[in-house]
Regions:
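Compositionally biased linear targeting/interaction segments
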Residues: 2-326
Length: 326
């Protein structure tokens, strides 16, 4: 009798353990379901607010274009940071950046071939502001090969399909302009440390074209919004022209025309004649901007970068990407 009672007791304990395990699993699964539901709701809220911030940025840029100013500068309303503000139980913030204050990677190569001014400028940025063990000549040559349509290795330092097909995973060169600066991470000789150091100075934008003839035009950097580091790499990269330009903007306000910029540079360098203006791709206007947005709802943080092109009469979103940097 006692033996049967012992077996029954063990059976009851096993059943209780199984029921307790099932109950715990149900509770855990319910908690996960609640968390998933909350994340979905917060994700939808965050996305809607990021798109609302995009609309805010577009309106700010449109209003700026309506002003009777030729130049774009960091003194204007669009350059002000939108601080974190409460919205529907969350926190949102935003900022507009002038992408034409950066070096456009796609200027290194165009249909006319290698742009020596752009080639020299990017090499200078890599030499001065990235890791000591970086190989600027190899990276810039690899960028030329990444964009150009042929399979000829540039300067015997670049890389074409055969160099990347042996990688794991294997891939090929794009043979087109970059769609994002992050494509630089695919280049031979590039690593994350070098890329992170270079990122504040670069962008990847479409090359401007002539509406009448469809020809590629020269990409211009906005002197009023460019960094001192980038400006110092223009020209032959040996004279501190960039520092002088930044000081002049701080002292007298933004430049209002390309002619004014070139006259200042010519006077600073004390060049009386044969001044090569092509070495100074500078202007005072901007057409490309990045609206950086951030939203926090619950435990979820969502960030989006919106690359926009502003024309004389319209504005359009070229790309949206999630993440901190584009």
């Amino acid at each position: 009798m006692k033996k049967h009672q012992g077996v029954a007791l063990v059976s009851v304990m096993i059943v209780i353990a199984i029921v307790a395990g099932i109950g715990a699993a149900v509770v855990v699964d319910q908690q996960y379901s609640m968390r998933r539901t909350a994340n979905l709701l917060h994700g939808n809220q965050a996305l809607m607010h990021l798109l609302a911030l995009e609309s805010w940025g577009l309106e700010v840029l449109i209003d700026d274009k309506k002003q009777e100013r030729v130049e774009d500068s960091l003194l204007e309303d669009w350059a002000r940071v939108l601080p974190p503000v409460s919205a529907d139980g969350g926190i949102v913030s935003g900022q507009i950046l002038d992408l034409q204050g950066r070096f456009n990677l796609n200027t290194v190569f165009s249909g006319q071939g290698v742009n020596q001014v752009a080639y020299r400028t990017l090499t200078c940025l890599l030499e001065r502001y990235t890791e000591p063990d970086a190989d600027p000549e190899q990276i810039v040559s690899a960028l030329v090969d990444w964009i150009d349509p042929d399979q000829n290795v540039h300067n015997n330092r670049g890389a074409e399909d055969l160099d990347y097909l042996s990688s794991d995973p294997s891939y090929r060169t794009a043979s087109r302009p970059l769609a994002s600066p992050s494509e630089m991470l695919l280049l031979k000789g590039m690593n994350h440390d070098t890329y992170d150091a270079l990122l504040p100075y670069i962008t990847a934008l479409p090359m401007p074209t002539s509406q009448e003839q469809g020809e590629t035009l020269e990409y211009m950097i906005n002197v009023n919004t460019a960094s001192e580091e980038l400006l110092n790499c223009l020209g032959d990269g040996t004279d501190p022209v960039g520092s002088a330009l930044v000081e002049e903007i701080r002292a007298s306000g933004p430049f209002t025309s390309r002619e004014e910029v070139l006259a200042f540079i010519q006077a600073f360098l004390n060049i009386q004649e044969n001044f090569d203006t092509s070495a100074w791709p500078l202007d005072v206007e901007s057409n490309y901007f990045q609206i950086s947005t951030r939203a926090e709802f619950g435990d979820l943080i969502m960030q989006m970068q919106h690359v926009v092109e502003r024309g004389d009469n319209d504005i359009r979103v070229l790309m949206r990407s999630y993440g901190q940097q584009w």
